[in-house]
Amino acid sequence: MTTQALPTTKLFDFRTLNLPQAYLGLVLLFTLLIIPFADAAQGNTVRGDYAFLSASELQHNQQSIAQNQASKETIRAYQQLLQQADKALQRLDQSVTDKSIVPPSGSKHDYLSLSAYWWPDNQKSDGLPWVRKDGQINPASKNADSDGVRLADFTAQVQALTLAWYFSGQQQYADKAISMIRTWFINPQTRMNPNLDYAQGVPGIAAGRGTGVLDGRYFATRIVDSLIMLRQNTRWTAQDEKQMQQWMTEYLHWLQHSPAGKKEAAAQNNHGNWYTVQVAGIAWYLQQPQRVVEMADLLKTKLDTQLAAEGSQPLELARTRSFHYSYFSLQAATLMAQLADKVQIDLWRYQTPNGSSLIKALDFMAPYSDEQTTWPYRSLDHMGVRLVPLMVQADKALGENRYQRWIKQADFTVIAGKEGAKRKGVVTEALRDTWLLAVTPQQNK
């Protein structure tokens, strides 16, 4: 199957059209982005197949929006996406060279971040070495002096812009996404070197740590599918593609062979799960399906260690943010399961030696997607709506409505005040993943 590229001339903005529904449907047929699926029977990636998104579900929701048949939840998610993309249009392109701290290498092209839960020791005159306070975020790790927040922000903007282009057809969004990608990865003056040698450093202990590999997860979960989607845009050049392939190839080598990467590969908690997602997602982009198989097998060994018989995750329950980390670990496992499906490996139904499984882990957490149901463990936060996209993907994979009760009653409201501000981003992401980037049974009715 060949793919069709969207025209580079400005397309219709579905927010402003006031055309008959039937005509709008005909317009859509000529503007839909057609991206082929993987040749699953052969276990081969096909150029253009997404890693974590579904082409058919994206097309379904794009068409429902254009024909004024989308659910109110889908419309809300779409409007929020455009708002985020419009804000991104006004932002300057970001680069690792923007930071004020110079890494030990002497090059600002090397990524640098500070570990969030480490603080100066107030018992020491120089504060060194820093000490760990689990769950308490040091503001010094979240400012522009280092790259941690910058990387998360940059990848979120690229993802929003690329999706906004896909759903609206407006070329300005793709142009900005491409510009941001070139600035971060390609342009010699601003590019990031393909390593995380100085990620999640702790003053007085280490300039960088294996746990810092986690920072790069967004390269897989946000950038990979954006790159695949942008292949359909003629402004994304063959040279762009070649240089991104080279960057990702070098970064994947670093992930697999650096001391930090090897340490993260051996991690038994959520870090190990995210390592598999990161390697597998980038390998998928580079058309290396065997690497995906290897990461699926590696995740099985993680689940064997992580999951108790009833589906709880004792390593994550021991944390001060036990709900967050139980969800966070499970999020990585479900993403890996989605990608493993494309190489004919069923991680959803895989059983650990003690009879547990990814589904049992979801079963264990599902009731707490309702935030009125008290999470019975110590936890500094409980944002249950995060679980909803995971349950949607599980139901799709299982071919049943196992979690429909929880999906239907999901609370996507945002309250006012400080707590509402914290919740807004979580709700926006969960709503998008559930209603715009996926198709629920309610949408198929």
Predicted feature locations:
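N-terminal secretory signal peptides that target proteins for export/translocation
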Residues: 1-19
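Generic detector of N-terminal low-structure segments
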Residues: 14-16, 32, 39
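Bacterial N-terminal signal peptides
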Residues: 23-36
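Extracellular glycan-targeting catalytic surfaces
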Residues: 41-261, 297, 341-342, 351-445
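Active-site-adjacent structural elements in folded domains
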Residues: 144-145, 234, 238, 256-267, ...
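An alpha-helical repeat/solenoid feature that recognizes helix-turn-helix modules
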Residues: 212-219, 272-273, 326-329
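Loop-centered beta-sheet repeat module
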Residues: 247-283, 289
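Long, repeat-rich segments with strong aromatic
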Residues: 277-376
